């Protein structure tokens, strides 16, 4: 029995040591790099948004709104292409026969609602619209707005196609919400052969009783992506190694 306990203790100590020293693959920003931002929309980022009660604390703690704006500015300063993956729900999406927990919640609170693909009536200033301070960056010809994702990941939109068609192999990922859409995009992009870095403090996640989405997201960014930047680290990286 004592030998068994020693073996278990040694095993746990070894495993803990391994995970405490995770490798750092690194991420070099070059001409094949793009920025992908998920859901920079009012329902997540405005205090008037329907999800603010869940994500607002994390948005404020991470300084997410300001950090996302810094990333938009960096994209212009260093001529890095930007791809926006938005989240929209049309009227026909509300007749789905089954939903997951967060899908059901989003539908119940009319999150990201629009009439249909061609109907923009009531869109301006709605929860599905861009946060106003980002519009001057997004509404430029150099920014690609993909078709909407419908659940969390980019499997249901054309993000990967748009990236590949512009010769993008590397992605700097940021946006909302951290443990859902941003993390799901990270996973799908990695599975599709993209090299992915995440700007951890340019995301935010729901914090609910007994649940900390931001902590979960930051853990998975570290374990899955090639590098996790802070916004300040990304600024310094681009100053030291401008994109060529």
Each language-model region and where it sits:
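Hydrophobic h-region of N-terminal signal peptides that target proteins for export
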Residues: 11-19
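Short active-site-proximal "capping" loops at secondary-structure junctions
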Residues: 41-43, 50-52, 82, 88-90
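Sec-dependent signal peptide recognition
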Residues: 2-10
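Short hydrophobic beta-strand that contains or immediately precedes a catalytic carboxylate
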Residues: 36-38
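Acidic/histidine-rich helix-loop elements
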Residues: 45-61
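Von Willebrand factor
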Residues: 67-94
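Active-site-adjacent betaalpha module
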Residues: 20-34, 43, 61, 74-78, ...
């Amino acid at each position: 029995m004592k030998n068994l306990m020693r073996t278990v203790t040694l095993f746990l100590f070894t495993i803990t040591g391994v995970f405490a020293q995770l490798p750092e693959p690194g991420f070099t920003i070059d001409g094949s790099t793009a920025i992908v931002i998920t859901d920079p929309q009012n329902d997540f980022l405005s205090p008037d948004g329907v999800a603010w009660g869940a994500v607002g604390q994390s948005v404020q703690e991470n300084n997410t709104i300001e950090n996302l704006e810094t990333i938009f500015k960096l994209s212009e300063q260093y001529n890095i292409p930007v791809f926006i993956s938005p989240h929209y729900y049309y009227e026909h999406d509300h007749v789905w026969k089954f939903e997951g927990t967060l899908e059901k919640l989003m539908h119940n609170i009319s999150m990201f609602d629009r009439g249909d693909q061609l109907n923009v009536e009531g869109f301006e200033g709605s929860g599905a619209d861009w946060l106003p301070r980002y519009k001057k960056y997004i509404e430029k010809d150099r920014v690609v707005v993909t078709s909407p994702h419908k659940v969390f990941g980019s499997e249901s939109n054309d993000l990967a196609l748009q990236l590949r068609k512009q010769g993008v192999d590397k992605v700097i990922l940021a946006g909302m919400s951290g443990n859902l859409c941003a993390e799901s995009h990270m996973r799908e992009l990695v599975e599709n052969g993209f090299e992915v870095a995440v700007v951890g403090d340019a995301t935010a996640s729901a914090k609910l009783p007994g649940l900390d989405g931001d902590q979960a997201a930051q853990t998975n960014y570290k374990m899955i992506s090639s590098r996790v930047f802070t916004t300040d680290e990304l600024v310094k990286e681009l100053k030291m190694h401008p994109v060529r």
